[in-house]
Amino acid sequence: MLSLAVFYFVFLGTEYLFDNRMALYTDPSGVVLAQSYILGVSVFGFLAYSLIEKWKSKSGNPTAFKAAGFFLPVPVIAGYVLLFAGTGYWVLLGSGCFLFLILGYLGSRTHYLAAQLLRGSRHPAKTVSVAYAVGLLLQFLNHNLLWGETVEGSFL
């Protein structure tokens, strides 16, 4: 369940960072609108997981998918760099949409694996809620023990 807690922490932390960065370039209603875009894109990533897994099993070439997974951190790091250092509404929105597409996919994968591990468990909801609470605790510690947006973001 540690993977769920880490996912919740990264997802919520990235959303918080995105909102703070967008607030530099738009008014509060613009931040809410941009947030709705990134959360909507994360739904596409979440739904894409099952389609990609089905496609992967039918393709007969798992090496290509492994290579894509191996190199995925490079554009993700670039997305975070743009989120930290990018200037302008559209740069931040683009990097945010990209990151949340990937986070949606990873969230779907994490929840699927957790569901597999919890199959037959007597208390799956309790386990997931504890993982969420741990993710929120990490978020609290990140915001209260680390100072500065760059340091907090680096912790993500």
Predicted segments, located by residue:
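Pair of pore-lining "gating" transmembrane helices in MFS-fold secondary transporters
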Residues: M1-Q35
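Helical-face signature of the major facilitator-like transporter fold
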Residues: L4, L92-G104
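Central cavity-lining transmembrane alpha-helices of secondary-active solute carriers
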Residues: V32-K56
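Cytoplasmic membrane-interface "Motif A"-like loop-to-helix N-cap segments
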Residues: E53-L72
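C-terminal ends and interior cores of transmembrane alpha-helices
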Residues: A68-T87
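Intracellular juxtamembrane helix-capping segments at the cytosolic ends
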Residues: L103-R119
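Glycine-rich segments within core transmembrane alpha-helices of 12-TM secondary carriers
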Residues: G107, R119-T150
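Symmetry-related core transmembrane helices of the 12-TM Major Facilitator Superfamily/SLC fold
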Residues: E152-L156
